[in-house]
Amino acid sequence: SLIGHNNKLLLNLINDVIDLSKIESGYLELRPDWVNLSELLDESVAEYAHQVPSGVELLTNYPAHDSLVELDSLRIKQILSNFLSNALKNTTTGHVEVFYEVDHQSVRIGVKDTGRGIPQNMLEKIFERFEKLDSFAQGAGLGLSICKLIVEKMNGRVLVDSQLGIGTTFVIELPCRSMLVE
């Protein structure tokens, strides 16, 4: 229903403002724990399975062996949720792919789509508060800004690569401890 949809938008805005306030005031707590990264990402993918547009495939691409990583799973899911939501809104054909790579000291988690892409002159601006590619797009334009701040708090970085009409890839690189699941 329209009321339920608007309630969800308002709740998301309130949560974004609260997160932004916590980050700016230094009160955002990270709670790293050992998690199976494949399982964590699969949970996020499952939450978006019902939002995949017709003509779009939601894919995963993980290493052959699962990895345990020491990360804040709640914040990773928050970041991935933002990336997935944006990718699914901007992809009408093709696919959206969630992937990760792990080495001994870091992890790279990303979302790649075959959507409309982002103009080169907007790539730096998309991480600014209240910045949206379209004035008619839903949301307050805080999601990517919050993601970047959280990743920086984790001593990581956000990378974006995009070409108009071809697609966009968002990747977070984070230092972390990891081990293979036997």
Which residues does each PLM region occupy?
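Helix-loop junction within the histidine kinase core
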Residues: 21-32
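Conserved catalytic submotifs in the C-terminal HATPase_c
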Residues: 31-36, 53-67
